[in-house]
């Protein structure tokens, strides 16, 4: 709630104006029945046409003024609520963008999407209702009750009884509905999760012909959400007929008992009519308040869910007193006694990691699945922070660098090429918005992407669909590599980034890349020995520990794990042939 209130402070002036116009609406509504009473008592009964005309004209003017005030209230309420929702949505997005991978793991992607859209929409809708009704209804209820008692105090018990019945009904519905609202948002999360999994994994689903299984999973989530929605909506729908019954019985009771008072000379017809109007205003006010009370718990769930994200402080932030890299920074990476354990995990993924990656050299990492290769290189851009030890960049602990300065030193290429909606050029410029057209073309040429880009209808201005769905996997990887090159970093990180390339393209790319990065630090994660065997240094990982460092030839002599990997992948003849063919490539 504190986040909502902080944003609300920006709209205090509009809120004060809204309060003023709301007061105008209420005063107009409370004034009209009294004038109607005067028309009946002093005009119609006494046959005084001037009283009818004068009071009638005043009623028309007041009605017009009240209508104008109501329009302004609606406009201001929408302006405040939508403005708050916009700022809250931006604040939430900025917080999510600042999360480390460890922070992301606290929430599912589907849940974050729901909180950023559905929950904020719920808050916006409720805010409009609160601003329009929560102020007006109590004032109208109190004012209407006072006016009613002034006109016919002997009938006030009817209003008290009607309000009591409404209170019991609303309290009962409130008690039943509130727990369901939280469940409802959880079910929306679940449905979004199933939908997202199906959209992302559509190819796999079709490949294994599991459409019916996935449809069943979606239908189960859909039916569960539908049942809960139906239950809540049916519960809310009970309020309307109950309200109608209360209003009708109240009207009949007022007319019945009012007629007896009129016949006994204790009440005038105009006063009874005014009392009836005020009674309806009081009852309607309670109906409006009940709508607010029903909406607020659901919005409160959304506020809590959004607050959970906003209250999650990023675990990786800029240091309070950041250090600067030396002016002659070259990109030297050094791991000193690094240990890393994932949050909530019992055992470390990496233990006692020590190595130096020198500028001008290619350092490769290899190991069995789960050995910690990708985790290790994910520590360098600070996707995670080390649990113990240090990672130094040109002698400076990366935790003492501003995140912007650190990222400016790194060209990162993930295993799966990730592209964004936009053009080919905008994707290559993604890491360096100031990159010139010449640099973009150079990066594409080095990444072996120039040929297929030139074949596109609009070349570098060709549109890339969301996720790069209109280009092949190999083309996505080449554009990802070009994006890293365009940053012109001192450190290149390739997380098995050549897996989607054919052998010929791979060889060409590596040959050109070797020239471009001859004075840079290059880190490569490989799954196959033939992709990393010509690196200047190969680091072998096994169960989170370094079990070997050296060249291919040295490791073939001294490292048993490396020998096992080589034996499982290639024959001796293949190793010799690849070694000869690949010389000078890296």
Can you say where each PLM-predicted feature lies in the sequence?
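Transmembrane helices of ABC transporter permease
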Residues: 10, 14-27, 129-184, 256-267
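ABC-type nucleotide-binding domain
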Residues: 326-586
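Short intracellular "coupling" helices and adjacent cytoplasmic loop segments at the cytosolic face
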Residues: 46-47, 82, 90-114, 118-120, ...
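An intracellular "coupling" helix at the cytosolic face of ABC transporter transmembrane type-1 domains
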Residues: 98-102, 118-131, 135, 139, ...
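Membrane-integrated ABC transporters
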Residues: 1-32, 36, 44-60, 65, ...
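Helix-loop-helix
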Residues: 48, 52, 143, 147-164, ...
């Amino acid at each position: 709630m504190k986040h909502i209130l902080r944003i609300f402070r920006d709209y205090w002036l509009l809120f004060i104006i809204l309060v003023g116009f709301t007061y105008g609406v209420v005063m107009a509504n409370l004034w009209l029945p009294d004038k109607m009473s005067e028309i009946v008592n002093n005009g119609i009964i006494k046959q005084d046409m001037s009283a009818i005309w004068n009071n009638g004209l005043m009623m028309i003017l007041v009605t017009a003024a009240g209508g104008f005030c109501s329009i302004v209230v609606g406009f201001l309420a929408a302006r405040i609520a939508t403005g708050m929702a916009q700022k809250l949505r931006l604040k939430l997005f900025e917080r999510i963008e600042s999360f480390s991978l460890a922070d992301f793991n606290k929430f599912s992607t589907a849940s974050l999407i729901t909180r950023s859209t559905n929950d904020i929409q719920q808050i916006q809708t409720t805010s409009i209702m609160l601003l329009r009704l929560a102020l007006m209804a109590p004032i109208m209820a109190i004012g209407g009750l006072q006016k009613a008692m002034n006109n016919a105090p002997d009938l006030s018990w009817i209003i008290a009884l009607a309000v009591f019945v409404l209170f019991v009904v609303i309290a009962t519905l409130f008690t039943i509905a509130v727990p369901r609202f939280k469940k409802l948002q959880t079910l929306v999360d679940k449905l979004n999760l199933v939908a997202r999994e199906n959209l992302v994994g559509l190819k796999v689903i079709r490949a294994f012909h599991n459409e019916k299984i996935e449809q069943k999973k979606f239908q189960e989530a859909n039916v569960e959400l539908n049942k809960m929605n139906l239950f809540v909506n049916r519960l809310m729908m009970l309020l309307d007929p109950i309200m109608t019954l209360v209003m009708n019985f109240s009207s009949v009771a007022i007319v019945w008992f009012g007629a007896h008072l009129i016949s006994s000379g204790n009440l005038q017809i105009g006063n009874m009519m005014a009392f009836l109007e005020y009674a309806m205003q009081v009852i309607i006010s309670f109906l409006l308040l009940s709508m607010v009370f029903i909406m607020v718990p659901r919005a409160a769930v959304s506020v809590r869910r959004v607050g959970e994200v906003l209250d999650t402080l990023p675990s990786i932030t800029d240091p309070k007193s950041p250090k600067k890299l030396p002016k002659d920074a070259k990109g030297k990476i050094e791991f000193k006694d690094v240990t890393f354990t994932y949050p909530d995990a019992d055992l470390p993924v990496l233990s006692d990691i020590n190595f130096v990656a020198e500028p001008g050299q290619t350092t490769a990492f290899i190991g069995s699945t789960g050995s910690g290769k990708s985790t290790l290189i994910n520590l360098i851009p600070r996707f995670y922070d080390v649990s113990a030890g240090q990672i130094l960049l040109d002698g400076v602990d990366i935790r003492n660098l501003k995140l912007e300065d650190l990222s400016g030193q790194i060209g990162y290429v993930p295993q799966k090429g990730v592209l964004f909606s936009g053009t080919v050029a905008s994707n290559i410029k993604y890491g360096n918005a100031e990159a010139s057209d010449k640099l973009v073309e150079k990066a594409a040429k080095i990444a072996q992407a120039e040929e297929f880009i030139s074949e596109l209808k609009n070349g570098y201005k060709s549109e890339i669909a969301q996720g790069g769905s209109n280009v092949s996997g190999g083309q996505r990887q080449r554009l990802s590599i070009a994006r890293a090159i365009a940053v012109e970093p001192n450190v290149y990180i390739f997380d098995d980034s050549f897996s989607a390339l054919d052998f010929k393209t791979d060889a060409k790319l590596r040959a050109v890349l070797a020239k471009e990065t001859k004075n840079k630090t290059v880190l490569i994660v490989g799954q196959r020995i033939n992709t990393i065997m010509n690196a200047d240094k190969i680091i072998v990982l096994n169960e989170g520990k370094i079990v070997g460092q050296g060249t291919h030839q040295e490791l073939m002599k001294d490292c048993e794990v490396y020998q096992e990997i080589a034996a499982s992948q290639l024959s001796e003849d293949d190793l010799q042939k690849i070694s000869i063919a690949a010389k000078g490539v890296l």
